[in-house]
Amino acid sequence: MSRIGRMPITVPANVTVTIADGNVVTVKGPLGTLTEKFNSRMMIKLEGNELTVTRPTDEKEDRSVHGLTRALLNNMVVGVSQGYSKTLEIIGVGYKAAKVGKTVELYLGHSLMSNGKPQEKFCIVEPEGITLEVAEKAVPITITVKGIDKQAVGQMAAVIRGKRPPEPYHGKGVKYADERIRRKAGKTGK
């Protein structure tokens, strides 16, 4: 059996899980509600406060989907009870971030867009279910992405980081707070 897939998921008291026909699972908690449709071959059972996933056969596909289903269910339960967050740091001279309403404006040293038009800032709008917090006065400037959907939080953080990934020579750019940049030595003079 899959080592991940066979582990039961403990459902907290303030979280309710409903399993509908077609393996549609809805998890409701204090932070919100998540709904996901899972592979119909997996058998998802709620017994008391434990959620278990079993697979029909030991075929390779069933084994891989078994662990995936359990991990996604666990992410849903943790998301609606505790939530997820990712912190990004902006490092560089003149690099700034400001929150205006539901939009975060990033000034990351770009003077031109890829099509040659002038570009001073990137505007990122908060999607549904995600909150962006900017600590403008902190050194380095930090942006915290929060939400109940782990995949959406990670995707939004990756989009922000992708606007100016950190470079290895000076370390300038947008990086995750726990990310270590492998630094390179510059040119050696004659």
PLM features: residue spans?
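N-terminal intrinsically disordered, cationic/polar leader segments
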Residues: 2-190
